Amino acid sequence: MSVGILGTKLGMTQIFDEAGVAIPVTVVQVGPCVVTQVKSKQTDGYAAIQVGYGEVKPKALNRPLLGHLAKSSAPALRHLKEYHTDSSSDYALGQEIKADIFSAGELVDVIGTSIGRGFAGNQKRNNFGRGPMSHGSKNHRAPGSIGAGTTPGRVYPGKRMAGRLGGTRVTIRKLTVIRVDAERNLLLIKGAVPGKPGSLLSIVPAKKVGK
């Protein structure tokens, strides 16, 4: 199992293939990530590596975290994430992981935080239909019935209603890597990924490959 990498969403653009067909892509600035911890089955019960990303000033982190990063001679890093692997012996503390761990045509899963849209109604949040807009109707965007009467005498848990929309962890699976720019540590991924430009992304090899 190959490990993943952390990156920052830069935005969307389009590129053209050999046939002149436009392909919408998201440009992601990935890494370089520093290996800050190596876990093995003998000592931790499972094999994994922890990587750090996003250099910041040391005063932005607390002392325990700075001490943890010092063990790998890593600078002050904002984000830490652990990736499971079949064998952690292939990695060493302080090793850099860059965009070249992926190749063009590879399928990846992209994990990020969706854009927060604040308090939203049922039409926008849950894709509900609306009521009549004329002929004296007073039920334009109302939610309608939310349950029965005296029995059960309550609203069932999980009932879809108005509330905060977005700002949650989202995984988009099996996106294709169109191009890898190893010199500038850029990935061009086909389609859209969660979040707004500047948001943090985790990119891992696709877990479910096939139809």
From Swiss-Prot:
Protein name: Large ribosomal subunit protein uL3
Gene field: rplC
Keyword terms, alphabetized: Ribonucleoprotein, Ribosomal protein, RNA-binding, rRNA-binding
Family assignment from sequence similarity: Belongs to the universal ribosomal protein uL3 family.
Start and end residues of each stretch annotated as Disordered: 122-157
Function comment: One of the primary rRNA binding proteins, it binds directly near the 3'-end of the 23S rRNA, where it nucleates assembly of the 50S subunit.
Presence of keyword Cell wall biogenesis/degradation: no
HAMAP family named among the record's database cross-references: Ribosomal_uL3_B
